[in-house]
From Swiss-Prot:
Name recorded for this polypeptide: Elongation factor P-like protein
InterPro entries in the cross-refs: Elong-fact-P_C, NA-bd_OB-fold, Rib_uL2_dom2, Transl_elong_fac_P/YeiP, Transl_elong_KOW-like, Transl_elong_p-like_YeiP, Transl_elong_P/YeiP_cen, Transl_elong_P/YeiP_CS
UniProt GO molecular function: translation elongation factor activity
Native organism taxonomy: Bacteria, Pseudomonadati, Pseudomonadota, Gammaproteobacteria, Alteromonadales
UniProt cross-references to SMART domains, sorted A to Z: EFP, Elong-fact-P_C
UniProt cross-references to Gene3D superfamilies, sorted A to Z: 2.30.30.30, Nucleic acid-binding proteins
SUPFAM superfamilies: Nucleic acid-binding proteins, Translation proteins SH3-like domain
Family annotation (PROSITE patterns): EFP
């Protein structure tokens, strides 16, 4: 049983009889001497799909839910359903667009290292690698000699993700992106 301060994004907890996956954590420190940090967590109910906001003290003990992570790749999109195929036993996992709306911006058919989070045999979310490689679909033309400057410009990836990239990056370039911070890391190695 970890403390609330030890829980990370993507962790599944058992809270009030429901299995919830942590989507986002905001830490705040109240004014005054008394009390420790507060952790406001945006949680996703794996059964109903509803979003729940809860606040925990840093010392609150939370119960982890029983979950497994299965390595998988995006196989195809069927309307608002994304179908991932297990890399070991080829089991298909269907996830709704709403359940993985943030994560799907980093995933295409070539993305390696994606894990489907499975609770009680049902897929409930995605666990992304720390970085992914995507192709720049649209950006302003690159400027010759711009690699020495620190200016950036907006770019849209093939998945629809929008990030800032250095001026020397052009349309069609393959780049590495940090999935936690939504930031450009560098050109992908060929």
């Amino acid at each position: 049983m970890p403390k609330a301060s030890e829980v990370k994004k993507g962790t599944a907890i058992d809270f009030n009889g429901r299995v919830l996956v942590v989507k986002d954590i905001v830490r705040s420190v109240p004014q005054g001497r008394a009390g420790g940090s507060l952790y406001r967590m945006r949680l996703y109910d794996v059964v109903t799909g509803s979003k729940v906001d809860e606040t925990f003290k840093d010392s609150d003990m939370l119960t982890l839910a029983d979950l497994t992570r299965r390595e998988a790749m995006l196989s195809y999109i069927d309307g608002d359903e994304y179908v991932f195929m297990d890399n070991e036993d080829y089991t298909p996992y269907n996830l709704s667009k709403d359940a993985i709306s943030e994560e799907i911006l980093f995933v295409n058919e070539e993305t390696q290292g994606v894990h489907v989070i499975v609770i009680d045999g049902a897929p409930v979310g995605l666990d992304l690698p720390s970085s992914v490689e995507l192709v720049v679909e649209e950006t302003d033309p690159s400027i010759k000699g711009a690699s020495a400057s620190a200016r950036s410009k907006p770019a849209r990836m093939s998945t629809g993700l929008n990030i800032s990239v250095p001026e020397h990056i052009s349309t069609g370039d393959r780049i590495r992106i940090n999935t936690a911070e939504h930031k450009f890391m560098g050109r992908a190695e060929k």
